[in-house]
Amino acid sequence: VRASRFLAACRGEPVDRPPVWVMRQAGRYLPEYLRVRAQAGSFLALCRHPELAAEVTLQPVRRFGFDAAIIFSDILLPLTALGVEFEFPDEGGPQLREALATPRQWARVAPRAGGTDAALVAEAVARVRAALPEEVALIAFCGAPWTLASYLVEGATSRDHTRTKAALLEYPQAFAQLLATLAETMAAYLEGLVRAGADAVQVFDSWAGSLSAQLYQEFAIPPLSTLMGRLAATGVPRILYAGGASHLLPTLAAVPCEAVSVDWRVSLPGAAALLPGRAIQGNLDPAALLASPATVRRATRQMMAEAPARGWIANLGHGIRPETPVANVAAFVETIREVA
């Protein structure tokens, strides 16, 4: 087992100081990222270029000394193995070739031979692991079945997921089957990335908060538990990120995982109380990093004052904003180290 501060904290073991990394830490707020992104030509081309994807994964670790790297990719990439086609326009979120809103369309979402995206991401993972310092952990990630299903049904990013919820209520059995297919596909994908060298996995249920606790329990928890359960055999820490999910924390306590990443809508003590035996990751509001460095330091110290003494990973409650000043990220990281 790698002697990593991050991995120890995931397992609830004592550490000399809290580990720190940032969701979307490889990205547009970094000038060095923008140079490589221009070289690749597009976001998707960058994701599909193992050498360049590895380079942008390493950039924030070099600059800030983060305790973990997260592979540069996107949650939609492994869907190509199911015959799903999409593109990323320069503005706005991803666009699927077609929205898949009916059981007949969901039945076509099935494993295809020759999907190359998973292999490209695995190659990037292997390159990063070979280049990373021994003590820095490498995280691989995927989308949770509910969040991926929302992209499939809506055909794009949605603010309220109305069509997806209507489809779930109208065709519960077929929708549950779609979620089961997504769970199995994501489990196989992450197993491959662990074989390639990932030290931990994070499952992003970004749209978890759009469901009531009852619907989340009935529809989202079974496939999510299947996915996490499959990953138990890898032996690596499993982290669940659930966005906007304060009302779901008691429900999430049933999901097999080592750590839960929470957003700023819930307090760290509140999350720890509702998720006994789990490490907690988070939860600074990314908006705080758009203020002055002094404000960043104050907000970070406030978060640290509330954090559990053991089993806490310092992070944001959501991905970092592209317009974030680099100096503010440095202030965030330095404060974690100084206070500790």
Where are these regions (language model features)?
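Glycine-rich, aromatic-flanked loop segments that form ligand/cofactor-binding clefts
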Residues: 5, 9-25, 66-96, 116-160
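Short, basic, glycine/proline-bearing loop/turn elements
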Residues: 35-47, 103-114, 233, 253
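Generic secondary-structure transition motif, activating predominantly at the C-termini of alpha-helices
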Residues: 10-14, 34-41, 110, 168, ...
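Active-site loop segments of alpha/beta catalytic cores
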Residues: 117-340
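Glycine-rich, proline-tolerant flexible connector loops at the mouths of alpha/beta enzymes
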Residues: 68-90, 96-114, 198-216, 317-319
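Short connector loops/turns at beta-strand edges and beta->alpha or beta->beta junctions
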Residues: 28, 101-102, 157-158
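N-terminal basic, low-complexity leaders that serve as flexible interaction/assembly modules and, when applicable
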Residues: 1-88, 221, 297, 326-340
